[in-house]
């Protein structure tokens, strides 16, 4: 038994060495450097002064608040909207393959290109969006220049971009549901809404959990789209 344990341990050694070199050592080095002030020539140990200065920054609270609003709204809307789109795309429609391709298209475009395109579309005077709304709204809306609208404008673009991946995950989860559940429900006289909330939604929970995690993490670490816009 001891020989078998030693034999299996030797197989773990290469992975442990790689993990140590790639993760543990850089993490410890980063923590040490965070407590110093240096310019690649001279360095001085400062303890927790850098952390105190960071958390005493006035704009930190605003940044954290906006980041949480961004992550919660983008992930929440993606989770709900992508689910209903996936339900529609897995239904009995003739053009569902074409529509799935259209839904997935935003994921093929780079984030910077999307940001630049929507920045042009949201221009207060020359933008396509304001031109389309000119029939209903007389004043020009400054989508990205107004502090009250800028965050929500970028949130809308992020939702448009991220719906594709969320929908694909939902489609895969819904298609993996055993069809016998739906057949049994139809025999019992269940309608479409009852099957949706009693069968599809509960059994698609693993896919929903994946969408929630990926969308929320993506919202927290989003930078390129915000920078581009």
What are these regions (language model features)?
Residues 3-229:
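A structural signal for multi-pass alpha-helical bundles of membrane permease subunits
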